[in-house]
């Protein structure tokens, strides 16, 4: 965001107008909760949420999402100082799947690298990290980390509709 220190009257008026527009949009979206999602041509669609951790679940449920289209599992790794255990990951995934109560949950496997660095991974600096060793490439070069995550995901899948997304595969 942008911080305005001692904004002038014109800037203050613009920000108040923007705030009013956002509140109106929020109010209109509230009216759509609980209704079927349809395109203009009448086709029913599902709207899924994208989340980074289980703390986002309340907002997902509050906003009536049809499921989770992307759970960014890398934040489990980024929010700590050492590799998460299988049990720690399992408990997180299980909580997400159970909370969604039968709705589809798509969890992306570890997508570390490029803009998401994790100190304890001890990754080499790269000229172009976006195209370098990241995501599935890291998982395949560090199978012990990948297998731990996959075991946790497979265990959690017994508690709901869990699907797995593999990043950076074309």
Regions found by a protein language model. Give the residues of each.
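Conformationally flexible catalytic loops at phosphate/diphosphate-handling active centers
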Residues: 1
């Amino acid at each position: 965001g942008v911080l305005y220190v001692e904004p002038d009257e014109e800037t203050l008026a613009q920000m108040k107008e923007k705030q009013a527009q956002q509140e109106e949009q929020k109010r209109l979206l509230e009216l759509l909760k609980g209704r079927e999602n349809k395109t203009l041509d009448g086709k029913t669609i599902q709207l899924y949420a994208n989340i980074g951790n289980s703390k986002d679940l309340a907002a997902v449920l509050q906003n009536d999402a049809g499921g989770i289209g992307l759970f960014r599992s890398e934040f489990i790794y980024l929010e700590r100082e050492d590799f998460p255990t299988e049990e720690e990951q399992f408990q997180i995934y299980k909580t997400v799947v159970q909370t969604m109560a039968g709705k589809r949950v798509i969890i992306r496997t570890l997508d570390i690298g490029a803009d998401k660095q994790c100190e304890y991974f001890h990754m080499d600096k790269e000229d172009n990290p976006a195209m370098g060793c990241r995501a599935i490439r890291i998982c395949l070069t560090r199978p012990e980390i990948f297998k731990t995550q996959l075991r946790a995901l497979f265990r959690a899948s017994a508690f709901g509709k869990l699907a797995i997304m593999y990043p950076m595969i074309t």
